[in-house]
Amino acid sequence: MANTETVLKDAMTSIDGVIGVALVDYTSGMALGTLGGGKELDLNVAAAGNTDVVRAKARTMELLGLKDEIEDILITLGGQYHLIRLLKGRGKSGLFLYLALDKSRANLAMARHQLKRIENDLEV
C-alpha cells in the first residue's frame, strides 16, 4: 500500500503524457495532494472545478434513477485529456484521482489501466 505522495509520483512517472495529477476530496473540493501542473494548469483550481463535474454527474444519475457507480469521467479537449477516476474502498469514499494528459503523447487506454492500478495501491 502506498501513501498519497507515492501514488502521485507513480502516476507522473508511469503514465505517458502526464501534465499533472491530483488526489481530490469531492465533498470539499480540496486537493489532498498535487504533482505537476504549472502556470497553464493550476491543479487546485482544476480540483475545485472537477468536483462540480463529479457532483453534477452524480446528481444526474440520481434524477435518472440509475443504480450504478461512476468509474471514471473523460473530458477531451483539443490538446489534452482530463481523466477523473472516482475511488472505491475503505477510506476512499468521496475521493477521486484527477489526471491531465497531453493528448499527443498519451495512450488513453493505458492511462485508465494505470489509474486503476494506482487506485488499488493507494492507502488513505
What are these regions (language model features)?
Residues 1-124:
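Non-catalytic interaction/Regulatory regions outside core domains
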